[in-house]
Amino acid sequence: MIRSVVRGIGSALPKRVMKNTDFEGIIETSDEWIVQRTGIRERHIAGEGETTVSLGAAAARAAIENAGLQPSDIDLVLLATSTPNNTFPASAVAIQRELGITRGFAFDLQAVCSGFIYAITTADLYIRGGMARRVLVIGAETFSRILDWTDRTTCVLFGDGAGAIVLEAAEGHGLTSDRGILAANLRSDGNHKEKLYVDGGPSTTQTVGHLRMEGREVFKHAVGMITDVIEASFEATGLTAEDIDWFVPHQANKRIIDASAKKLHIAEEKVVITVDRHGNTSAASVPLALATAVADGRIKKGDLVLLEAMGGGFTWGAVLVRW
């Protein structure tokens, strides 16, 4: 059977780092207040000339180089983002141009913070269906451009950045010891869409709008939804939490991460945490955390890695991948 194997990985972050203390002159808050409630200490903020496309292209180049490939080897460019450069065309097409790719196809996918999980799952289907051999999966965001910088409950949470992987078709044996994606489960429930949203859009207000969130409601639902979809992935493969080498969750809030790991009985030392230095980078969150753990030598070939995310909609999902 065909498996979608991770061939390469890369990341990119804006130059500017904004620490919690930098907010003290803008809004009523403190480093202690932010760290205690979120675990975030700093985040990267896009500056002039830094966009979703430029960050996504930089992460993509790094992933392609890490894979030992050329841009011309890519069949599909799939970008997960909620902050595209333009309403249309897709920012994936712009990244395709930046990379000099003139073959295959490219499109954007929007599932907010779950975007990278949705994109990996979509890429896996294209690969196993024979429509693409190599897929460049990117999560890139510039959420700083849609924040209300007077709202202390949201503006301190988010950062900008991008991460990317190259998925490649490989022959597997149908075993959980195979390298590649072993299981993926996605969910959504539009009944919760008013709990996390942007209050604008071309078809309604003809503006971009700002991010709005009912933080307590999101927190209340997050742990249960995340663990349920992870359990579905375990059930599909016969694997358990004890088999996991590394848990790479969406980096939204350390309290949500800790509660999810505890409910799943995953040891703290197996959890990859980057929320302290990146903040919540939405669709870029999971690939940035992955890239960090690969770069520092934690995630190695053959490791079983659990990915998960939850975002506006609500959308949520989980992926089990053998590195």
Swiss-Prot record:
Biological processes, Gene Ontology terms: fatty acid biosynthetic process
Annotated compartments: Cytoplasm
InterPro entries: ACP_syn_III_C (IPR013747), ACP_syn_III_N (IPR013751), FabH (IPR004655), Thiolase-like (IPR016039)
Enzyme nomenclature, EC number: 2.3.1.180
Residue span of region ACP-binding: 251-255
Keywords: Acyltransferase, Cytoplasm, Fatty acid biosynthesis, Fatty acid metabolism, Lipid biosynthesis, Lipid metabolism, Multifunctional enzyme, Transferase
GO MF entry, a single one: 3-oxoacyl-[acyl-carrier-protein] synthase activity
Coiled-coil portions: none
Keyword Cytoplasm recorded: yes
Catalytic activity: malonyl-[ACP] + acetyl-CoA + H(+) = 3-oxobutanoyl-[ACP] + CO2 + CoA
Cysteine pairings via disulfide bonds: none
Main location: cytoplasm
Pathway note: Lipid metabolism; fatty acid biosynthesis
One GO cellular component term: cytoplasm
Active site per database record: C113, H250, N280
Role summary: Catalyzes the condensation reaction of fatty acid synthesis by the addition to an acyl acceptor of two carbons from malonyl-ACP. Catalyzes the first condensation reaction which initiates fatty acid synthesis and may therefore play a role in governing the total rate of fatty acid production. Possesses both acetoacetyl-ACP synthase and acetyl transacylase activities. Its substrate specificity determines the biosynthesis of branched-chain and/or straight-chain of fatty acids.
Assembly and interaction partners: Homodimer.
Family: Belongs to the thiolase-like superfamily. FabH family.
Annotated domain remarks: The last Arg residue of the ACP-binding site is essential for the weak association between ACP/AcpP and FabH.
Name of this protein: Beta-ketoacyl-[acyl-carrier-protein] synthase III
Organism annotation: Brucella melitensis biotype 2 (strain ATCC 23457)
Lineage, highest ranks first: Bacteria, Pseudomonadati, Pseudomonadota, Alphaproteobacteria, Hyphomicrobiales
